[in-house]
Amino acid sequence: MSVYAPNRQTIVPRVWVGCLACYNGGELVGTWYDAVDADRVLPEDIHGCPTTHEEMWVMDHECMPVRGELDPATAARWGHVIEAEAPQWREAYLAWLDDQGIDRPEDAPDADTFSEILVGEWPSFSDFAEMIVADLGILDGLPESVSNYFDLNAFARDLAYDYVILDSPHGTVWVYQNV
């Protein structure tokens, strides 16, 4: 089976780690880090000098399938889970996690499991269905007088029940196994 796989810019999950004591005191003190490093950020890293403030908190994030704030250890686990995925499929991975309502890193499939779930990316689901017809040879050997009656749109409509289909932000669709 062929797979349409465009070259995408790599998604790197990032987090804004801030000092919780400063935040509670009305001051925003923090900076952006790669999510995989979130659990290693020290108060001294944020403040630039030794401090009595001990609690760090992730107050904002990018490219992560969670809503709202989270602790640095969870952010780091998400970072590792997402970065384990092939760079060209991270965007599809995040979309699928969101669609499935997965909001804890321990519930997310690992890269090997996701590679079995993700079928690929196509310009449309009809293009995917057309590829299935060709790859399986559904119309091979049929006379043209018979194959002309094959309704690809109806086939694609029925086939869609067997898959999860998500629109990508690039005008294409991601196709996943229905698990």
What are these regions (language model features)?
Residues 2-52:
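N-terminal ordered "arm"
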Residues 4-9, 19, 129-179:
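Acidic, proline/glycine-rich low-complexity IDRs
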Residues 15, 31, 56-57, 164, ...:
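A broad, low-specificity signal marking well-ordered, structured residues that form hydrophobic/aromatic
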Residues 24, 40-42, 65, 157, ...:
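A broad, structure-centric signal for solvent-exposed, well-ordered loop/edge residues
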Residues 25, 54, 90, 105, ...:
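Residue-level signal for secondary-structure boundary elements
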Residues 37-41, 70, 120-123, 141, ...:
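Short coil/turn linker and secondary-structure boundary residues
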Residues 40-106:
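Structured domain cores in non-transmembrane regions
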Residues 93-137, 141, 145, 154, ...:
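Extracytoplasmic/secretory-pathway segments with low complexity and glycosylation-like composition
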